Amino acid sequence: MLTVHQPVERVLGVPVHLLDDYVGDLHDRLRRGVGAHVVTLNSEMTMQALESPPGNGSLAEAIASADLVIPDGAGVVFYFWLRGKRVFRCPGIELAERVLQLAGEVGPKWPVFFYGGAPGVAAAASAIWQQRCPGLVFAGMEHGYISPEEEPKLLETLKQLQPRIILVGLGVPRQELWIYRHRHLCPQAIWIGVGGSFDIWAGRKTRAPQWMQQLNMEWAYRLYQEPHRWRRMLALPHFAYLSVVTLRNKPGL
C-alpha cells in the first residue's frame, strides 16, 4: 500500500511517488525484508487507469495499492512540468537493472525470478545477467505464454521458492494486475512490472539511442521498432490534451 512517509503526488488523479533515490528505497526494503509492488507509470498506463472500470481488481486499484509508483514516462514528467515541478524520469528498465546489480552483490540471499516474454526470452535474459553479474542467483524463470491450467503450478513454485526479486514482463495492464493479485504469495519480494525489458536484455530488441532518451523521445523509437503499437500510442496526445485542460481548470490536480 502507499506509505505515508513517501511524498505522493497525483497525475490526473493517479498517484506517483517523488523520491530522490528510488534504488535506495528498494535496497532498504530488501535489507529489511519488506516487500513492495513497484509500478513504472507512463502516460499510456495513466490513460488506461483512467479508462478502466472502477473498483477492486481494476488497473487504477492496482496502481493505488502499489508501494512505489515511479515517473517512468516522458508524459508524466511533462505533466509535472506544466505544474511547475521539476521531475526527472526514472526509466523502469534502469531501476530493474540497478536492483539486479544489488542482488548480484548479495548473492543467494536475494534470489531472482523472471516471468514473462516469449518462450526462451526470459531464459536468454537471465543468462545475459548471470554473465554481467556472476553473483546473481536465479530462483527460476518462466515465459509469459503459459496456459491458465499451468498457472497454478507457477504460483505454487513462487510460493515454495520465495524469491526476493520478481520481475514480470507481461505488458500493461496485465503485469500490474497479475502482481496485484498474487504478490501476497511472496510478501518479502520486490515485484516490478518490466514490460519488454526481457527482450532488450536478451538482445531481441534495443533501447533508443542515448540522445533520444535524454530528449524523452524513447516512445518514438518504440513506435519505430513496433509500428503495430500506433493505436496504443494515440493515448499520448490524449494524455497531453487532458493534462493541459485539467490543469487549466484544476491547477492542483
Each language-model region and where it sits:
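Short, flexible loop segments at boundaries between secondary-structure elements
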Residues: 143-147, 187-225
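A short helix->loop->beta-strand "cap" motif at the edges of active sites that frequently abuts
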Residues: 35, 108-109, 186-189
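A short, gly/pro- and small-residue-rich
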Residues: 53, 57-65, 176-196
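A transmembrane-helix-recognition feature enriched in membrane-embedded lipid enzymes
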Residues: 77-80, 208-253
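Short glycine-rich anion-binding loops that position phosphate/pyrophosphate groups of nucleotides
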Residues: 42-45, 75-76, 170-175, 197-198
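Conserved beta-alpha
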Residues: 77-157, 161-162
